Design a protein with these regions (language model features):
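Extracellular Cys-Trp
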Residues: 1-101
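Structured, hydrophobic secondary-structure cores that serve as assembly/anchoring elements
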Residues: 82-254
Length: 254
């Protein structure tokens, strides 16, 4: 099957433009299993699926109006856009430059409700002052389907930029470990301090490109030995950065 063939490979985004609920459910379960059990950190982009409530799944509400086209054809564009998006960037407000005609016929309250429900939305943005009366089709906000916010997983986890940072951190740490330490460096204090120093360098680079903020060395403790002699345990904190989306102004009349 497709899933069996793709599972061994590294990729950032998986997309399915169809509306078959059986296939959608299969891919959602595959995404959850890979993210939580095998360490494969990718997101799934699908069309029209509601109440998914999972940071690893992005569901587009808008359909396309082109004759003969799959209603969920925006999945193709968004799959590429999300895959190409850097960890210090967001797809929010990105102009849709694809070949399909997007249905953006949503009222403001409908847009707000859709976002509240975890649906990825495109909307029309015009600027009559500049002469752009027709407007552009843009991404409203770069979110995933996660909606049931808790103390352990706050609203930050609804943002795809945050998920990108966390996923890439997991991938980069794993690659660092596999490339330099796996089967090569002893699991003693000196070996774990060496791993810690490389981790510090990695997250200093994350902070340099503004993917994370407020990082200090103390956020990354030295790894410890696990229950087995070959096991290394590492718990640390990072604070992903997010792009500006909302502006609140107070005008004081002098």
């Amino acid at each position: 099957s497709f899933i069996e063939h793709i599972e061994p490979y590294y990729f950032n985004i998986l997309g399915y433009a169809g509306s078959d609920e059986t296939v959608q459910s299969l891919l959602i379960n595959f995404t959850k299993r890979c993210r939580e059990n095998t360490g494969s950190k990718f997101q799934l982009v699908i069309y029209g699926k509601t109440k998914v409530n999972y940071p690893g799944v992005i569901s587009i509400k808008n359909n396309v109006t082109d004759t003969g086209a799959e209603k969920g054809s925006l999945v193709y564009w968004l799959t590429g856009k999300e895959a190409a998006c850097a960890i210090n960037a967001s797809c929010t407000n990105a102009i849709y430059d694809g070949e399909y005609t997007v249905n953006t016929n949503f009222k403001q309250y409908e847009l707000e409700q859709a976002v509240s429900d975890g649906m990825f939305m495109f909307h029309n943005v015009s600027d009559s002052v500049s002469g752009n009366v027709l407007g552009d089709t843009r991404v409203l906000t770069d979110i995933n389907t996660f909606t049931e916010v808790t103390k352990a997983m706050n609203k930050d986890f609804t943002l795809n930029q945050v998920i990108r940072v966390l996923d890439n951190a997991a991938i980069d740490i794993a690659r660092l470990f596999n490339r330099i330490y796996l089967g090569k460096v002893q699991n003693d204090a000196d070996g774990r301090i060496s791993l810690w120093k490389d981790g510090i360098a990695l997250f200093e680079e994350y902070q340099r490109v503004r993917a994370i903020q407020n990082f200090v060395d103390d956020d990354l403790p030295v790894p410890t030995q696990g229950e087995e002699k070959t096991a290394v345990l590492w718990t640390f904190e990072i604070q992903p950065t997010a792009c500006m989306e909302k502006l609140y102004c107070t005008v004081v009349v002098a």
